[in-house]
A protein has these predicted regions:
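Metallocofactor- and cofactor-centric catalytic cores in central/energy metabolism, strongly enriched
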Residues: 2-296
Length: 296
């Protein structure tokens, strides 16, 4: 039977082999999965357009980061938004290599990549390229959140382009292994970048007791990773008699001195992101969902 989708990028994937039906375990529909593959193929086409190893501009780097981040689990289930991102990537490629689209003798060197080539590749090649792809997708989440706070690293941005180029290129196991190892190396730099962004913006985290009790009165729950979104909400609700509670992976926010100074950041509600539907079902409060903990 023909697969409606194929996705195995998260640890919850069906049967530890891959989600192939009409929807994934995360709730992602097959049409969304196909659009994410199309977006990834467009990003590889953009990397091909700059030949992978050339120095890229800040603008191109940010588009690549945003595009990769869009394909991360629980970031976006909005098909219209994904299609818009695909067009943004294609427009950037057209800006960089305008003659390719009108070339009378196309060489194919800047073509978009068909992700079915990867999913149906030799097992070892598929495994190594998937390690690279899923590694840079996760890294893109760190880079994106750092960028939101106006922190960036040119070496990190450049590696996203290099890695995408390698995924779309016919490579041997021996030639792919150094890139796999470099994913880990650059990921450490990217984690350091995000840590620098968070600590220089919100202070160095310190041990903090966090209550799990919800007080009487109006409140808002915030789930996800985006500290900037939480900051904006705290500033907009200050002095209005509305308490704020974190959920899931937003728990560490309570440890940052800048954020904990808001007295209406009261505590933490619930458990992990995958329990949202059960925990939020009868919650008498609005919920602010931030990336990357969205569930449809």
């Amino acid at each position: 039977m023909e697969q409606k989708m194929f996705c195995f990028q998260c640890e919850q994937t069906l049967g530890c082999t891959g989600c192939t039906g009409s929807a994934g375990v995360c709730g992602k529909k097959a049409d969304t999965a196909k659009l994410q593959d199309e977006l990834t193929g467009a990003l590889i086409g953009l990397a091909r357009a700059v030949d992978g190893a050339q120095t890229i501009s800040k603008r191109t780097g940010q588009i690549i980061i945003e595009g990769l981040f869009t394909t991360v689990t629980n970031v976006s289930f909005d098909n219209a938004a994904i299609e818009k991102m695909i067009q943004k990537v294609r427009a950037e490629k057209e800006r960089l290599v305008p003659d390719c689209s009108s070339c009378q003798s196309p060489c194919g060197k800047t073509d978009e990549y068909d992700m079915r080539q990867l999913w149906n590749a030799d097992e070892d090649i598929r495994s190594l390229k998937s390690l690279i792809l899923f590694g840079i997708r996760g890294m893109a989440a760190y880079a994106y959140h750092a960028n939101v706070l106006n922190y960036e690293d040119a070496e990190v941005d450049q590696f996203f382009c290099e890695a995408l180029f390698r995924i779309g290129y016919e490579e041997s196991v021996e030639r792919l292994l150094p890139t796999v190892l470099k994913v880990g190396e650059i990921n450490l730099k990217c984690m350091a970048l995000l840590d620098k962004a968070n600590t220089q913006t919100y202070g160095t985290p310190e041990p903090t007791a966090v209550t799990l009790a919800v007080e009487k009165g109006p409140f808002i729950v915030v789930t996800g990773h985006d500290l900037k979104d939480l900051q904006l909400l705290l500033e907009q609700t200050e002095g209005k008699g509305i308490n704020i509670y974190t959920h899931g992976e937003m728990l560490p926010a309570h440890a940052y001195p800048f954020l904990k100074k808001f007295s209406h950041l009261k505590g933490h509600f619930g458990t992990a992101w995958q329990n949202q539907q059960k925990e939020f079902d009868h919650l008498p409060a609005p919920i602010l969902y931030t990336t990357n903990c969205l569930m449809p």
